[in-house]
Amino acid sequence: MIVRDEERNLHPCLDEIAHLFDDIVIVDTGSLDDTTRVIREICKTEALSFPIEEKNWFNKYEARNFGFARLNADWILSLDADERIDPAQILNVRSVLGDGEADGFFTRWTTYQDGREIADYKLSVFRKDFRSSGLVHENVQQDMRLRGGRAVWTDLIHLRHFPDPGKTAFKRDFYKQRLRRAIQVEPSWYRYHWFLGYALFREGNPEAAEHWLQATASARSRQFPVECLNAHLVLAAIHASHGRQEIVARTLNSALSLLSEVGDDFEVRINFGLRPWIEHASQACSRGHLEEIAAYEFCA
């Protein structure tokens, strides 16, 4: 777990589950509140210090890897302080590890925000060998792909995510600023383009979003196949809202073509809604019912 000023979240996150783990590693990146004291109280251990200045927030993946390397266990359950997992499901974590073929497990990940429930997934359980990467929205998927690993789906684990409801306009702007800077540093890491485009789309700025979504979709990246497919979905919805039937059809045909190319990717396989959405949207487009084409919600 990576923390910074999380004293309010730690008790609801860890009180009922801390004693169920073989080892707990929590990395503090520079808390100014009582976070480290609360960790000591709950976990009977000290947080590891890995200070990150606000201006250098791209180092978060390094903080995760710092923690991974110090864990005395073969498998990692990666949690954030604003996530919750029921104690009984910790036992489920142990049970899924019996699948000797898998290197990781995607789990249900539901975000509760502004009175809405957003269903998504997270690669939350994985072998200790893998490393986190990415300047924003870091994860281990890229390392697992590059090393020929394989992650599968499990229904036995459900993480519930309760993000800070006070996400101000300043924080939203800073988030987009970080994504723009990340694109400059790693221009072929199309995960950043996708998240920037989707952030602009959610804010009601589809014209600005279209540029970044098109860059993602056109990349057809095998390193970021889900992001490229997601970009197709949102682009199709944008074009449908403007009545651009021909462009919608081309976008959906491109999505189906890409899906056939990357369908064997372990993350594409667990995106169970992708193909049904594309096929439904294609049928709606062919009938001229563009009003039926709306992107489903992603967590960002």
PLM segments and residue spans:
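Conserved donor nucleotide-binding strand/loop of the catalytic core
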Residues: 36-62, 66, 70
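Flexible helix-coil transition and linker loops at the boundaries of alpha-helical arrays
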Residues: 182-185, 218-228, 260-271
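Short aromatic/hydrophobic "clamp" motif used to bind/position activated sugar donors
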Residues: 76
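A conserved acidic beta->alpha catalytic loop
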Residues: 16, 20, 28-39, 57, ...
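Acidic helix N-cap motif at the loop->helix transition within catalytic regions
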Residues: 11, 33-42, 88
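Catalytic-site signature of metal-activated, phosphate-bearing donor transferases
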Residues: 60-68, 79, 85-207, 220
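Short, well-formed alpha-helical segments that are part of the catalytic scaffolds
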Residues: 2-20
